């Protein structure tokens, strides 16, 4: 005998699976409320969802916010989730690259201030547009500040100079 009960539910999702998917949509909606307006404009969203995301910031009471985010989750069902995830992943990737580059420049600054001429030569080889005289002067001021336990204003100038060189070399300026 064929069990018709099992055959009836083969293609359907369980109640738990549906709840998980709805919860994931609400979490994605929460994430979209934290995205900047220019990034939000790049996402393929309906006008109704854009309006609901803008209103989400106005709800501060826990219950009201939770209700509104459930509404946002409901609106998210009709969206192209793959396209939204792709844009958000691209943003996360560029953010990680920016942070990695930023930390690399901080390491260069610290090596130049704490280091010797070899570090300066390596830096000049990596960034050929460097004005050695200006960079040496900035490093010398930063070393004096560090020796006298003063606030690191000159170290910030070294970092700014290094960052400007990096942006120039990458064509960002």
Swiss-Prot record:
One of its GO terms (cellular component) is cytosol. Disulfide bonds: none annotated. GO terms for molecular function: ribosome binding; rRNA binding. Gene3D superfamilies: PSPTO4464-like domains. Transmembrane segments: none annotated. SUPFAM superfamilies: PSPTO4464-like. Its main location: cytoplasm. CDD domains: YjgA-like (cd16331). Keywords: Cytoplasm, Ribosome biogenesis, RNA-binding, rRNA-binding. It comes from the Bacteria. GO terms for biological process: assembly of large subunit precursor of preribosome. InterPro entries: DarP (IPR006839), DarP_sf (IPR023153). It is found in: Cytoplasm. Member of a network of 50S ribosomal subunit biogenesis factors which assembles along the 30S-50S interface, preventing incorrect 23S rRNA structures from forming. Promotes peptidyl transferase center (PTC) maturation. Belongs to the DarP family. HAMAP family: DarP (MF_00765). This is Dual-action ribosomal maturation protein DarP. The gene is darP.
């Amino acid at each position: 005998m064929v069990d018709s009960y099992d055959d009836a539910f083969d293609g359907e999702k369980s109640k738990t699976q549906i709840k998980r998917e709805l919860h994931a949509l609400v979490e994605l909606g929460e994430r979209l409320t934290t995205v900047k307006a220019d990034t939000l404009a790049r996402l393929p969203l309906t006008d109704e969802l854009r309006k609901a995301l803008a209103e989400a910031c106005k709800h501060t009471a826990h219950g009201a916010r939770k209700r509104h985010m459930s509404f946002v989750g409901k609106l998210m069902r009709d969206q192209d989730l793959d396209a939204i995830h792709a844009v958000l992943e691209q943003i996360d990737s560029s953010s990680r690259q920016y942070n990695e580059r930023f930390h690399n420049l901080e390491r260069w600054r610290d090596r130049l201030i704490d280091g010797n001429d070899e570090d300066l030569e390596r830096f000049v080889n990596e960034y050929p547009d460097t004005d050695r005289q200006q960079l040496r002067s900035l490093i010398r001021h930063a070393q004096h500040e560090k020796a006298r336990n003063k606030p690191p204003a000159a170290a910030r100038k070294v970092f700014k100079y290094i960052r400007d060189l990096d942006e120039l070399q990458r064509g960002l300026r």
